């Protein structure tokens, strides 16, 4: 590149520096930097010249050029010659000082240039800067800034000049009056001092190692004098901060005696500024530097300033941190650093100041002080070593503070103490207890808002930090092990530490394991030496009980069990082996569940089994008694945890059951009865469970103790008449009685069965009844307390169940049975019949269920009362509650219903005869006929249950008639059509059971399965659907089954019952009765022959009435008989029915399809009527020039509707199959010629008004009607798969519309080929006569249909290929372009359907396709597009010699389409180009290779095409082009980057491609660049942006020898135009390309 070209390139970029888009401007700067990387001197000179010549250029753009120069200089300054460096230094100096005003961006950029040059030419830069320092005159602020920056960037180069600089600056310090100038001086002095300190700290690398601090001390002190005594007094806060920042590093350079002399003024001066400045970080940082300097010189003055320093610093640390800004947080760190300096120099004075402040009640003061204490404990450990006792004693008051912030700070201090040995001192245990207390804080008391800087609210909570601290201290601080063990054990049992159990257990487990590793002696606890520790019994009970709620407290169950397992040597020496086996099983069970999935009862039973096994292994009565005593003592601890207290009662019962001492057992039982909190329901239940478990081993003692308690003074006081009204409330007495009644119930339920029967009536029930009713003044008073009632019912239920489950139940005579049943029924009747609030009626019915099974049997009236009372109590309840109404309510409802079912089956079991069954059904009959659906559903469900039970337990000893079969079937069968689905299902089950009962009474075995009866089960699915047609069809089938299995003698009773059902208030059931009556008449009407005419007549007359649907089958039958004699007349008369057809007419049409022969005759007549008339008539209603409207003719339309109705009947199937080809072709042509056809005006008006309820709801629109009929024909002919495929693909909807009709015909052909292939030969034969149809729509439809058939192999398999090709070839010259296009598509489909036949027909196919490329005058003809798509499919399959002759012509013909405005043409042409390349792999002629090379650039650029399909086609084409270019690297790059579905990083890919292109095809540079120039003018922004990017990469990878191929001036000019493109992205890429052109040097 000549110098003029380089200059032109730089000039072009510099002219673009004024672009308004910041990204473009940044890219221009980057391009300039690229030029500078290659040609730094020329680029820098061009920039210098540009700035010099454009003196009026605005300062933002001057700054941009200067920044570009700085970036070049930062890496290429070493390549500058002295003259260039001098020129740049002068330019930057001039730019920097051109204006005296502060223009920071511009002056900063110029300063940056000087600093960059100064790294290499420090002397020249310093010379220029010193030249700008005029004696007695204030320097420019930018000069000061540059000197400061140089001091940091090149300290070794600047520091030797410092004396000269300072000598020039110091005299004018006093002259500086403006605050901005003074700030600049302060910044410079700060940087000078920092540079000097760096120089002095690294003298071994310094150019002059003889430099000492004294060289600067005098000048620095002079500057200090001005800064401190004059400028620090300024009112400008920014200046004061700048002064303070400078004083910090300057203090290290002051002479020692001067620093000592100035400290009394300096320190108060700095401290005073704390009150004036909000941002105190710089003050604290500088103060820390001054303190370090003072300490380093051993200042004595510091001692006198200490009080003021501590007070000021303490006030800073106590300031609330309201912001999480870095400066605020950094200030805290700097203040603490100051405290560290003071702690190391004056520890006593520091503690004397800090510790008294811990006693203050002010939150900020206490938190800040604690923060400092923690810091000095960690940072000045050596100085604090002998101060530990004082620090510990000072924590007394902070430990009592309830403020959460103070608590957090205290916990952090204790953590620091633990690491440094404080907690081993006297008083350390108080700290540990404090941590445990904080671990026990309840979660609900945690602060909701996080502290400053906290991302997770929980992470900073007092409890969370305490838990972490306790665990870390226990596990990581070895010296704490002997302090915490076994001390932490004493926190396990107190209630106030319950919340800390989980962290306590985890820490204790870790400590215990460490002790075990140290040896048995170290692990075993000496309880004599640790009197405050809980006993082994207390620990065992506590840990076992809290494990019953294992997921509370962050999983305390698992933690407690692990601790219990680890402590086994300290619990009892025999437990080791057993606990090591069982505890892991319990832990594994917890791991398998969550809090939501854990079955609580099962878990508690596992724990109780663990306890029982443990007691059995110990087998020491004294130990067991001691454990029971401890468990009883712990009862008050769980008053606020009812579930755990309930479990504790169970543990007590289990432990007492294992005890052998009767005295201990009775004593503890007495104490439990006396101390129980009877007002709590959970406690009453727990107490009862305890007595029940204890009774397993001590029945006599348990009952005796209950008797003793009743006779005791405590109990008698509670029930005395005076106490009822005075001392105690009646409610309290009822609670005590409830508990006692429950105790007796649980004793009966748990005690051994062989012992309990003898006690039931004499002891247990006597006491239960005695406690339930009380006599006052000789009068029996019944309780009103529902809780007491429920306890009575529960206990009686448990007693009854115990009797029933006993092996001696059969011989047991229960004398109080009738009394108890009456009592239960009284409770049931007392419950509200419309709501279910308590489980009383459920429990009472369950009790009755058990009582019914016990001797003696109930009399008939009592049985009836029980059944009637329970049904009335349950059946009228509102429907089953939904889940959202409450899971408990739904559960109670279901359980109550199950209790009723169990009771009824128990009663039926006592009378297993047809009469007994009928009695039960008679009780249910009113509910079966109830007008309320939920009552019918329940009644049918219960009936089905009873019938199933009766059938399962049927025992027939002799053949007897089931005399009430017809009556019962007549009651249930109409319910198969009930509005409630559940009722319908249950009705079928009832009929099913009744039929099998009849078979049983006929002598068939119980395992016999009747085929007819079994069909009922398969019909149940049909009853799920609410569709009446399906429902009544199922009812008809049920009627057929009944008719086949009903004995002749039962027919009359059944019919009579059915006729009664016609008046059923539930209309659906009435209709079902009609359906079943008709079925019975058809199947069994022989015995009622004289009644048939009358019945048919009645049903036909009902058809004319509004509610005559139930007689419709009879009317249909009549029409059928008429049609068998006069088919043509019936068809003609029905076709005259007005459109749209009403529902009665539709049903009559369907009746004609009952018999296949008649159906075929009817279909033939309808086809004839449809084909006879024209499908539509054209009408010009308004404007003469308007396209005429097409209006459907009535006769074909009526015939179409009739065809649909006839074929919608299943019986029409054989007739439809017989006429399949004719029906399919006629209906397909009907569809094609009705697209866009309108209804006659009168029918349109009816459609707008809406059909009446009696009219069919089917769409009458001509095309939709034809499509529906075609679909119905396919369904009826067995082509369901075709219909399903069309449904899934939306084919039917496409057929209905003008825009989608062609695609709909295509999809129909595809579905036919796939699922109805054998039908096609006859269909095509019928279609043959339609090729020359006068209707264009019909030609398009048939061509689309035929074209798609070639897409399937069915054409070849059925030997239809030749005929299809001939049919399509004949249409190549059709006047309709759509037909010609579809012909090409069909020919191309041969590639998919019969690929092996393509070679045979190759010339014919290629000729047609190539001819299609030139179809018509329109270059963008859809026929041409179809030809390209077809060629892409065929080229791989034809013979290569057939393709060669047209290959070049095709490539040339499709090339213009690459840049077509139409996306479809771009996609098709590019993809075809890829296929042509694929075919030519390894055998590419030169003329075609030239086309490949010519297409390379367009393909690469269109990868950025706005249309994704075009970009995808380019990916494919490039992958195919790769092998033809004979460059493995390029081909590999195409394969790697351009795979489908892989994200393309276009820049990276283009860079790689250009590298390979230029390496292997260097001669293509000019040609490729010329193509790029063409795309500079592309209408697509992305492509226009890709072109200069492509250009830049080509140039980047080119070699200098390729320069002759490039017209650089033309390229620069074109890119210069792009720099003015409206799209920022294009301008950015153009600038980037210009930066790359430097490569052509």
UniProtKB/Swiss-Prot annotation:
Role according to the record: Lysosome fission factor. Recruited to lysosomes by RAB7 (RAB7A or RAB7B) at scission sites and homooligomerizes to mediate the constriction and scission of lysosomal tubules. May sever membranes by inserting amphipathic helices into one bilayer leaflet. Lysosome fission is required to maintain their steady-state number, shape, size, composition and function, and to accomplish regeneration.
Repeat found in the keyword field: yes
Quaternary data: Homooligomer; homooligomerizes at lysosome scission sites.
Name of the coding gene: MROH1
Protein name as annotated: Maestro heat-like repeat-containing protein family member 1
Alphabetical UniProt keywords: Lysosome, Membrane, Repeat
Family: Belongs to the MROH1 family.
InterPro entries found in the cross-reference section: ARM-like, ARM-type_fold, HEAT_Maestro, HEAT_MROH2B-like, HEAT_type_2, Maestro-like_HEAT, Maestro_heat-like_prot, MROH2B-like_N_HEAT
Provenance organism: Homo sapiens (Human)
Source organism superkingdom: Eukaryota
């Amino acid at each position: 590149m000549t110098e003029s070209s380089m200059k032109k390139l730089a000039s072009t970029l510099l002219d673009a520096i004024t672009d308004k888009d910041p990204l473009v401007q940044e890219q221009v700067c980057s391009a300039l930097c690229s030029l500078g990387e290659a040609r730094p001197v020329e680029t820098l000179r061009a920039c210098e010249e540009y700035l010099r010549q454009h003196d009026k250029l605005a300062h933002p753009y001057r700054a941009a050029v200067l920044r570009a120069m700085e970036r070049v200089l930062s890496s290429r300054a070493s390549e500058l010659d002295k003259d260039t460096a001098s020129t740049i230094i002068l330019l930057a100096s001039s730019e920097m000082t051109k204006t005296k005003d502060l223009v920071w961006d511009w002056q900063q950029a110029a300063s940056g240039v000087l600093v960059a040059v100064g790294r290499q030419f420090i002397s020249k830069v310093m010379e220029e800067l010193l030249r700008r320092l005029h004696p007695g005159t204030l320097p420019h602020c930018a000069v000061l800034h540059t000197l400061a920056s140089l001091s940091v960037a090149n300290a070794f180069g600047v520091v030797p000049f410092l004396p000269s600089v300072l000598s020039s600056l110091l005299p004018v310090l006093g002259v500086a009056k403006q605050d901005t100038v003074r700030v600049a001086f302060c910044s410079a002095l700060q940087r000078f001092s920092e540079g000097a300190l760096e120089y002095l700290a690294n003298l071994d690398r310094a150019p002059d190692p003889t430099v000492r601090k004294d060289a600067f001390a005098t000048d620095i002190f002079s500057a200090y004098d001005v800064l401190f005594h004059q400028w620090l007094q300024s009112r400008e806060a920014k200046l004061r901060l700048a002064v303070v920042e400078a004083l910090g590093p300057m203090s290290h350079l002051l002479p020692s005696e001067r620093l000592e002399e100035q400290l009394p003024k300096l320190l108060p001066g700095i401290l005073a500024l704390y009150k004036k400045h909000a941002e105190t970080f710089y003050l604290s940082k500088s103060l820390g530097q001054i303190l370090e300097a003072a300490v380093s010189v051993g200042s004595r003055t510091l001692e006198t300033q200490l009080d003021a320093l501590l007070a000021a610093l303490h006030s800073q640390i106590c300031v609330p941190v309201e912001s999480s800004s870095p400066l605020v947080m950094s200030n805290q760190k700097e203040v603490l650093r100051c405290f560290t300096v003071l702690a190391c120099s004056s520890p006593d004075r520091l503690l004397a100041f800090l510790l008294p402040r811990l006693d203050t009640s002010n939150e900020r003061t206490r938190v800040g002080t604690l923060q400092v204490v923690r810091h000095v404990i960690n940072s000045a450990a050596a100085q604090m070593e002998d101060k530990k006792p004082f620090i510990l004693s000072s924590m007394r008051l902070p430990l009592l503070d309830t403020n959460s912030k103070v608590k957090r700070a205290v916990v952090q201090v204790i953590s620091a103490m633990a690491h440094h040995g404080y907690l081993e001192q006297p008083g350390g245990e108080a700290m540990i207890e404090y941590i445990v207390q904080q671990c026990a804080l309840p979660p609900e008391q945690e602060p909701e808002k996080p502290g400053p800087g906290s991302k997770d609210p929980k992470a900073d909570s007092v409890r969370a930090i305490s838990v972490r601290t306790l665990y870390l201290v226990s596990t990581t601080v070895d010296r704490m092990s002997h302090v915490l063990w076994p001390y932490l054990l004493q926190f396990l049992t107190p209630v106030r530490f319950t919340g800390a159990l989980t962290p306590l257990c985890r820490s204790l487990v870790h400590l215990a394991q460490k002790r075990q590793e140290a040896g048995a002696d170290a692990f075993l606890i000496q309880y004599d030496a640790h009197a405050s520790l809980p006993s082994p019994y207390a620990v065992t009970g506590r840990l076992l009980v809290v494990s019953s709620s294992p997921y509370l407290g962050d999983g305390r169950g698992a933690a407690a069990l692990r601790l219990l397992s680890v402590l086994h040597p300290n619990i009892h020496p025999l437990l080791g082996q057993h606990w090591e086996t069982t505890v892991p099983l319990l832990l594994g069970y917890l791991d398998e569940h969550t809090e939501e999935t854990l079955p609580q009862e099962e878990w508690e039973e596992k724990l109780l089994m663990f306890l029982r096994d443990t007691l059995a292994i110990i087998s020491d009565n004294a130990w067991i008694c001691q454990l029971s005593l401890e468990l009883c003592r712990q009862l008050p601890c769980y008053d606020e945890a009812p579930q755990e207290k309930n479990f504790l009662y169970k543990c007590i019962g289990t432990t007492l059951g294992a005890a052998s001492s009767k005295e201990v057992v009775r004593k503890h039982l007495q104490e439990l009865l006396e101390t129980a909190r009877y007002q709590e329901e959970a406690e009453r239940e727990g107490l009862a469970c305890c007595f029940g478990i204890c009774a397993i081993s001590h029945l006599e003692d348990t009952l005796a103790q209950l008797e003793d308690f009743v006779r005791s003074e405590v109990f008698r006081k509670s029930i005395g008449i005076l106490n009822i009204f005075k001392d105690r409330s009646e409610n309290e007495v009822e609670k005590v009685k409830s508990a006692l009644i429950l105790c007796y119930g649980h004793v009966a339920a748990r005690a051994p069965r062989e012992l309990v029967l003898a006690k039931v009536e004499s002891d247990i029930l006597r006491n239960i009844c005695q406690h339930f009713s009380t006599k006052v003044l000789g009068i029996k008073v019944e309780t009103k307390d529902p809780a007491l009632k429920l306890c009575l019912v529960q206990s009686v239920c448990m007693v009854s169940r115990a009797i029933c489950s006993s092996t001696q139940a059969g011989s047991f005579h229960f004398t109080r049975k009738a009394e108890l049943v009456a009592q239960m029924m009284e409770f049931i009747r007392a419950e509200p019949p419309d709501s279910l609030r308590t489980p009383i009626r459920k429990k009472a019915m369950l009790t009755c269920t058990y009582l019914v099974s016990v001797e003696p049997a109930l009399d008939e009236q009592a049985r009836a009362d029980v059944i009637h009372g329970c049904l009335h109590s349950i059946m009228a309840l509102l429907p089953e509650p939904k889940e959202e109404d409450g899971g408990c309510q739904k559960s109670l409802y279901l359980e109550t219903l199950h209790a009723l079912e169990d009771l009824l089956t128990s009663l039926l079991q006592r009378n297993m005869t047809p009469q007994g069954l009928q009695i039960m059904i008679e009780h249910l009959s009113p509910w079966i006929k109830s007008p309320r659906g939920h009552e019918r559903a329940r009644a049918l469900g219960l009936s089905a249950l009873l019938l199933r039970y009766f059938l399962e337990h049927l025992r027939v000893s002799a053949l007897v008639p089931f005399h009430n079969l017809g009556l019962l079937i007549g009651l249930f069968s109409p319910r198969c059509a009930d509005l409630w689905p559940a009722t319908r299902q249950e009705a079928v089950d009832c009929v099913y059971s009744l039929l099998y009962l009849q078979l049983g009474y006929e002598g068939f075995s119980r395992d016999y399965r009747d085929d007819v009866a079994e069909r009922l089960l398969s019909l149940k699915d049909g009853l799920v659907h609410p569709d009446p047609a399906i429902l009544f069809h199922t009812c008809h089938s049920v009627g057929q089954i009944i008719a086949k299995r009903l004995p002749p003698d039962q027919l009359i009773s059944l019919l009579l019952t059915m006729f009664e059902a016609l008046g059923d208030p539930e209309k659906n059931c009435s209709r079902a009765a009609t359906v079943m009556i008709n079925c019975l008449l058809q199947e069994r009407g022989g015995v009622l022959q004289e009644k048939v005419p009358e019945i048919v007549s009645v049903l036909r007359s009902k058809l004319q009435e509004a509610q005559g649907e139930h007689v419709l089958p009879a009317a249909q039958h009549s029409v059928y008989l008429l049609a068998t004699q006069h088919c043509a007349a019936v068809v003609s008369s029905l076709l005259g029915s007005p459109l749209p057809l009403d529902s009665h007419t539709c049903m009559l049409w369907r009746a004609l399809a009952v018999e296949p022969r008649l159906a075929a005759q009817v279909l033939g007549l309808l086809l004839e009527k449809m084909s006879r008339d024209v499908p539509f008539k054209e009408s010009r209603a308004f404007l003469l020039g308007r396209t005429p409207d097409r209006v459907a003719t009535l006769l074909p339309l009526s015939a179409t509707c009739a065809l649909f109705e006839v074929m919608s009947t299943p019986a029409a199937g054989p007739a439809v199959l017989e006429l399949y080809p004719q029906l399919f072709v006629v209906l397909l042509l009907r569809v094609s010629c009705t697209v866009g056809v309108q209804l006659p005006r009168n029918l349109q008006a009816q459609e707008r008004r809406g059909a009446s309820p009696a009219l069919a709801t089917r769409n009458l629109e001509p095309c939709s009607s034809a499509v529906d009929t075609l679909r119905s024909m396919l369904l009826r002919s067995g082509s369901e798969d075709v219909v399903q495929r069309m449904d899934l693909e939306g084919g039917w909807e496409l057929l209905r519309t003008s825009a989608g009709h062609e695609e709909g015909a295509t999809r129909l052909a595809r579905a036919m080929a796939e699922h109805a292939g054998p039908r096609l030969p006859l269909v095509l034969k019928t279609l043959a006569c339609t090729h020359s149809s006068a209707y264009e729509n019909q030609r398009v439809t048939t061509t689309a249909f035929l074209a798609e058939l070639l897409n399937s192999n069915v054409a070849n398999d059925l030997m239809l290929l030749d005929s299809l090709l001939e049919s399509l070839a004949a249409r190549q010259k059709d006047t309709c372009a759509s037909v010609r296009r579809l012909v090409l598509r069909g020919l191309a489909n041969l590639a998919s359907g019969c690929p092996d036949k393509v070679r045979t027909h190759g010339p014919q196919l290629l000729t047609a396709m190539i001819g299609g490329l030139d179809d018509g005058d329109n270059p963008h003809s859809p026929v041409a597009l179809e030809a390209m798509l077809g060629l892409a499919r065929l080229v791989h399959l034809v013979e290569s010699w057939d393709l060669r002759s047209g290959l070049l012509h095709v490539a040339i013909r499709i090339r213009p389409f690459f840049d077509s405005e139409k996306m479809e043409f771009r996609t098709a042409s590019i993809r075809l180009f890829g296929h042509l390349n694929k075919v030519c792999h390894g055998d590419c002629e030169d003329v075609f290779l030239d086309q490949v090379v010519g297409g390379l650039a367009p393909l690469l650029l269109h990868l950025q095409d706005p249309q994704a399909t075009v970009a995808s086609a380019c990916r494919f084409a490039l992958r195919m082009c790769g092998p033809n270019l004979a460059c493995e690297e390029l081909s590999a790059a195409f394969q790697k980057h351009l795979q489908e579905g892989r994200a393309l990083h276009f820049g990276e890919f283009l860079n790689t491609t250009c590298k390979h292109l230029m390496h292997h095809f260097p001669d293509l540079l000019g040609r490729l660049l010329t193509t790029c120039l063409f795309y500079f003018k592309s209408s697509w922004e992305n492509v226009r942006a890709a072109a200069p990017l492509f250009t830049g990469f080509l140039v980047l990878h080119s070699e200098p020898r390729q320069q002759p191929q490039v017209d650089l001036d033309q390229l620069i000019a074109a890119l210069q135009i792009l720099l003015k493109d409206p799209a920022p992205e294009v301008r950015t890429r153009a600038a980037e390309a210009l930066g790359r052109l430097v490569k052509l040097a």
